[in-house]
Structure formats: C-alpha cells, structure tokens
C-alpha cells in the first residue's frame, strides 16, 4: 500500500510517495519537486554501538549523472567518490537533523539521498533535505521533529523563495534555512554583501514558509508514521557522578578548566582522569571505561555554569571580548602572496597562487550551468595544529566544508575575469587550532589575496559567536569569538563573514532544538561589531589596499580582444596554430567564446611576441601594412614567408631586391627573417608582398 501526497511550493508541485519504494528501510520518501526526483531513506541499526560517546549519524547525498542525461567520464564510466557539492550537501542535511535525535541514542542511523532526476528549476539539494526530514519523521527512529527547509534568493531587492535557475543566476543571496515549528535550527548562506537587516528579514521569512511544509509533513505522519521504538539510554549512572565529585570537587574542576592556555587545561584534565582511574580501579572497576565521558560531562556542566551564571569565560575574557589578534603578510618569499592571521591559539597561514584561466577547476556534476570555477580555496587541518599524532589521509568532509565556507565568503569581493584574468587558488594551512579556524581562514585569505596583488573590492573578515542556554528561552548568553572549549560545551557555532557593508557568508551549527529570533538577532549584531573591529584594528594596519601589481614570481597576463569569428584561425586545425605559438614563445594562451585572448607568461618579450603573432593571424592583409616574416620555402619564382603560425605569404622574385637577381637564393636562404610591405591584391586577386619596397619609415 502506498499513497502520494502533494502541495504547492513556490509555484511548483512537491509530491511525496510513501510506501512505494524501499520498503525495507525504516522510512522512505520518494520525492518529486517539479521534474526533480530524489529517493530519501532513513535506516537504523537494531542495537546501539558499544564503546562510543556520540550519536553515530551518517548522511549521504548521491549524485547520479544519469539524472541529467550524462555518462560519467574516466575509464570506468561510473560514478566514483562523492563530489565536493555532494559532500557539502550531506553536511547541510546533517546539521538540522542531528540536534533533533536523542542525545543518548547510540544506534547507527544512515540518511541516504539518491538523486535520480534533476530539474534545473527545482533544487535537488532542497528536495533531499525535505526528503530526509520526511523519511525520519515517518520512520520508527526516535526523532523530535518534524523540520523543514526553504531556500531564499534576493532578486532586485525582493526575496524569492526556492528560486529557479534563472533567479539564482542573478540573485544577491543564496540562503538556506531549516526550522522546527517554533525555532530556526540551521542557517547557511552565501551573499553579495547583504545588509544585516535584510538577512534577518530573509531568515524569518523562510521560517514562516517552513511552517507550511511542516503542516504538510504532519499530514503524512498522521497517516503513515510509525510508532517510535524504544532504545537503551547510554547515560552515565548518577552514583558515578556522585563518586566523582567526592574525588574532584566542583571548585577543583573549575580551577582545572580556568586558563587561557589550552595545553595547560588538557594536562589538568588528564591528571583528573588519572586520579579517578586510580580510585575506581579498586572501588568500581566497572566504571573505568566511562571515565572519559563522565569527565567530559563534568567539564561541560562546569563550563556552562561558569559562563551562564557567573559570566566568567574559561580563559578569563569578558563575554564579548575577542582574543589577542595579529595579522601579517609576505612570510613566504617565493610564493605569489601570503598572509597569516592569529586569533588567540588559532593561527592560519594562507598562500595565494595565480595561474592562467585554463587552470580553473573543471566541474562535472549535476549543475550543467556551472562548468568550472575560477576561484578555489582549500583548507588543511594537520594533526600537529592540535598537538596530536595522526597520519595525513587527505582532506575529509570537515576540511572540504571549511574550505567551501571561506571560498563562499570571498567570492563576492573578487574582481571579474575581465578585470583580472587569472585563476586564483588560496590554500589555508592551519598552524594552530583552538576554535573558529574557518573564520580565521577568511581573514588570512583576504590578507594573502591583497598581498598577491588581487584587486579585491573590500576586505572580508569572519568571526564566530557561541551560545549557552538555560532552562527557558529567555535564559541565555551569546558569546563573541568562541574558543574550542566553548564550542564543544556550548549550544551554537554561529559563523558570519563579511565586509563593512554587509554579509558574504553564514554557517550556523547548533546542538539544541533551535534558536529564537532574539538569539539570532543578537548573534548577527555581535558578529558585525567584531568583524568591523578586526578589519579596522588588525587587518588594515597589516595591509590597507591590494598591491597594485602581482608579485615578481607570479605569471603576468596580457589580454587582447579578437573577432570571435577569427578564433578558429588562431587555434588552427586540431590546435596546430596555437600550439606552434606556445612552442615558440613558452607562454600559455586562453581564448574564450567572446574572443578574449589571455597570454600568460613570465618573460615579457616572449609574451609580446605571442601577442604580435596572434594579431598578425587575425589581421586582414591591407596595402601598405608592414610585416616581419621567416623564409620557410624557396621556389624559382619567389619565396614563401611565415608571418605567424598558419599565416603565410609569397614574395615574387621581382620584389625581393632592387637589383636584378636570377635566383632567389642569391639574396635569401631558408630561415631568414625579413620585413615586407603589403602591396595589396594583384590582377589575379592574390595578396602580394615586397621586400625591396619596404622602407624603414614604414
């Protein structure tokens, strides 16, 4: 038995088939939004996973290229590892769902989203988010939902909900908001310097749209929802906590965590754990495996009380005080640009590399409108940054997510391709970490880009606000610039990046069941204040304006415009002409469909030579024009010259010398470079050239 439910969502039909496919999953929703089709399933293990102190949730978003009628490239001709977009979408699905599961639930849960058909006007990412929420809501998996998600654009100053592809292309905002019935639970945004008040308007408008979807989900659950199953709670026994407090008093725990040096705090906690292990080894050996989790919760309770009740932060700062800041540029002498930003014990060194546009990242995903991206930001988080030993396995989901967030924050201030015809890569290396490395990456990337001579429009800074809540909605405290401990034990990580004039990126993670309007408004306000302080007091003194030229080790680019109809002449058959220019000059050449030609190299003379070759190729021969050519062939009647690869002409023997000659070889040999003047067309309509009529004044 199955049933289809439908509603109108932003002028398009959203329909959900329940009971039609994937019947063995705990919950399955076959989603249709326009012509976009996504199968969302939720499954849970029968038993809890032993020996863990976290909820084992896994979210997958699978892009199948058949969804857009494409065959995967490569040798195997099948989908391989998840794309960057798939990883980012999995993370954005995870964020609103995770807080709504029970904190002490230890059964493995997997949310899988299979994209099977894509309508460019109906977002598969949004469809998957709604599908995951529905599949869990109708399943027997414990879940405190429902929740719903809306995307918001800003076109000509007006908010647009769940925008089409055409609207997204001109939108100043790409906002995703997830909500429960009464609170906002997730915010993700990229924006073109959208003012704070407009951003708040968009967030709360999306929250209202979400209520319509939640009512729709309620109808599905009422008819097809399963009874939620029971589970074994993994809470620490109360008698163990009582025993711990006899060994380590609350005052001693507070003293252990109250320091501005992370390593000192960690050493204090290690000593507490060792002390408890000695005591319990004799009295309660069955508790030994619970010590780590118990001490974690003891720390958490202590830190939260210090902040909420005593207004005292673990490192001694005021509630809205930012950690010690430092900024500098040009630490690495041979790179194209470098910048380092330090915030307390968080330190990021970012390196900028410039390259021709042909080095832009090629994209082969479901979004057929996006073929490549010119700006790339990569974030690395090595184990030494937190004093650990761990082999490097390449970037994980967290690294990809942090890199994308900083990338999104900086895109609005980058120059256009016409203004700055380079592909740009920034790499943020985490030197040291104690919270908010992604926002430090935004600051360091801004410094590095300016040092590299990238003419960004404005400086961008990022900051994160935290939250500690009490028993009521009115009992809370928003913290500015959270460190790692406040992130771990707090309720929110609200990251905001932007310029003086507006927001460029937001990412909000929470561990509670949502945020009230008052909390969101305060977080937005606090991040703006902190952002302006960082730009004015720290970043501007380090480098106030982008360098007027790229660095001496960066490639130079000269750009000219040619008639688009002449592109084929420059490229030549199978690339023969353009490859010959590249071989002779050592430059790189890019040509777009509009006829913009970019010549990239480090030797100015060779770049000028390549430009002259291209201009010669696209120039129509006219009487009186002077050209320089190389003798490539000699015949009895004259010599053939190559003016540029693929561009040749002939000089008749009578036009070679002012003196009469019997043989061309008397004056010219193969390889000679000579200057000629164009005589126009002869009686046969052929272009003729003359060496003897060339004069220096030509």
Curated annotation (Swiss-Prot):
One Gene Ontology CC term in the entry: cytosol
Organism from which the protein derives: Lachnoclostridium phytofermentans (strain ATCC 700394 / DSM 18823 / ISDg)
HAMAP family linked: PNPase
Cellular localization per UniProt: Cytoplasm
Keyword flag Nucleotidyltransferase: yes
Pfam families membership: KH_1, PNPase, RNase_PH, RNase_PH_C, S1
Cofactor: Mg(2+)
PANTHER family: POLYRIBONUCLEOTIDE NUCLEOTIDYLTRANSFERASE, POLYRIBONUCLEOTIDE NUCLEOTIDYLTRANSFERASE 1, MITOCHONDRIAL
Enzymatic reactions: RNA(n+1) + phosphate = RNA(n) + a ribonucleoside 5'-diphosphate
Gene Ontology biological process terms in this record: mRNA catabolic process; RNA processing
GO molecular function: 3'-5'-RNA exonuclease activity; magnesium ion binding; polyribonucleotide nucleotidyltransferase activity; RNA binding
Functional summary from the UniProt entry: Involved in mRNA degradation. Catalyzes the phosphorolysis of single-stranded polyribonucleotides processively in the 3'- to 5'-direction.
Domain KH: 555-614
NCBIfam families: polynuc_phos, PRK11824.1
Protein name: Polyribonucleotide nucleotidyltransferase
Enzyme class, first EC level, given as a word: transferase
Residues annotated as domain S1 motif: 624-692
Binding site for Mg(2+): 487, 493
Family indicated by similarity: Belongs to the polyribonucleotide nucleotidyltransferase family.
EC number: 2.7.7.8
Keywords: Cytoplasm, Magnesium, Metal-binding, Nucleotidyltransferase, RNA-binding, Transferase
């Amino acid at each position: 038995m199955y049933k289809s439910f439908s509603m109108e969502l932003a002028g398009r039909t959203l329909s959900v088939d329940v009971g039609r496919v994937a019947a063995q999953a705990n919950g399955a929703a076959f989603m249709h939004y326009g012509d976009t089709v996504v199968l969302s399933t939720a499954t849970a293990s029968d038993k809890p996973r032993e020996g863990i102190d976290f909820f084992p949730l896994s979210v997958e978003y699978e892009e199948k290229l058949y969804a857009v009628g494409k065959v995967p490239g490569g040798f195997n001709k099948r989908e391989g590892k998840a794309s960057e977009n798939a990883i980012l979408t999995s993370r954005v699905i995870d964020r609103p769902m995770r807080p709504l599961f029970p904190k002490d639930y230890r059964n493995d849960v997997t949310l899988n989203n299979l994209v099977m058909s894509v309508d460019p006007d109906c977002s598969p990412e949004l469809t998957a988010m709604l599908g995951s929420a529905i599949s869990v809501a109708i399943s027997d998996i414990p879940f405190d939902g429902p929740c719903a998600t809306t995307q918001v654009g800003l076109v000509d100053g007006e908010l647009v909900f769940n925008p089409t592809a055409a609207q997204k292309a001109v939108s100043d905002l790409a906002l995703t908001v997830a909500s429960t019935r009464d609170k906002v639970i997730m915010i993700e945004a990229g924006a073109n310097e959208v003012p704070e008040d407009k951003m708040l308007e968009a967030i709360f408008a999306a929250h209202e749209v979400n209520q319509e979807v939640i009512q729709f989900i309620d109808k599905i659950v009422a008819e097809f929802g399963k009874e939620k199953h029971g589970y074994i709670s993994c809470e620490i026994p109360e008698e163990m906590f009582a025993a711990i407090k006899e060994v380590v008093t609350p005052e001693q725990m507070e003293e252990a965590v109250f320091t501005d040096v992370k390593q000192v705090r960690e050493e204090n906690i290690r000593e507490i754990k060792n002390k408890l292990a000695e005591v319990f080894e004799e009295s309660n050996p069955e508790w030994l495996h619970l010590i780590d989790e118990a001490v974690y919760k003891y720390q958490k309770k202590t830190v939260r009380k210090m902040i909420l009740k005593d207004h005292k932060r673990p490192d001694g700062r005021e509630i809205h005080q930012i950690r010690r800041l430092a900024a500098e540029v040009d630490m690495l002498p041979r790179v194209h640009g470098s910048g380092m930003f330090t915030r307390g014990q968080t330190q990021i060194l970012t390196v900028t590399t410039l390259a021709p546009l042909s080095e832009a990242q090629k994209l082969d995903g479901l979004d057929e409108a996006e073929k490549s991206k010119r700006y790339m930001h990569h974030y690395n988080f090595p184990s030494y940054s937190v004093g650990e030993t761990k082999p490097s396995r390449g970037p994980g989901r967290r690294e990809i997510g942090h890199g994308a967030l900083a990338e999104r924050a900086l895109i609005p201030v980058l120059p256009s391709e016409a203004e700055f015809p380079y592909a740009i890569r920034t790499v943020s290396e985490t030197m040291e970490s104690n919270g908010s490395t992604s926002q430090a990456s935004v600051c360091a990337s801004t410094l590095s880009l300016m040092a590299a001579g990238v003419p960004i429009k404005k400086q961008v800074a990022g900051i994160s606000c935290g939250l500690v809540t009490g028993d009521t909605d009115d009992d809370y405290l928003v913290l500015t610039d959270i460190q790692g401990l406040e992130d771990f034990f707090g309720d929110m990580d609200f990251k905001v990046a932007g310029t003086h004039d507006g927001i460029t990126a937001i990412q909000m993670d929470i561990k509670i069941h949502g945020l009230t309007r008052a909390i969101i408004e305060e977080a937005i306000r606090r991040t703006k204040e902190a952002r302006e302080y960082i730009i004015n007091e720290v970043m501007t003194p380090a480098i106030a304006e982008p360098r007027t030229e790229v660095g001496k080790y960066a490639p130079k680019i000269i750009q000219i415009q040619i008639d688009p109809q002449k592109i084929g002449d420059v490229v030549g058959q199978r690339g023969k002409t353009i490859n010959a220019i590249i071989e002779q000059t050592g430059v790189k050449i890019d040509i777009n469909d509009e006829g913009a030609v970019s010549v990239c190299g480090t030797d100015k003379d060779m770049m000028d030579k390549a430009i002259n070759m291209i201009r010669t190729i696209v120039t129509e021969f006219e009487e009186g024009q002077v050209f320089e050519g190389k003798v490539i062939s000699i015949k009895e009647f004259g010599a053939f010259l190559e003016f540029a690869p693929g561009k040749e002409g002939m000089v008749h023997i009578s036009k070679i010398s002012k003196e009469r000659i019997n043989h061309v070889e008397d004056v010219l040999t193969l390889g000679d470079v000579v200057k000629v003047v164009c005589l126009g067309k002869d009686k046969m309509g052929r272009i003729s050239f003359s060496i003897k009529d060339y004069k220096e004044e030509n």
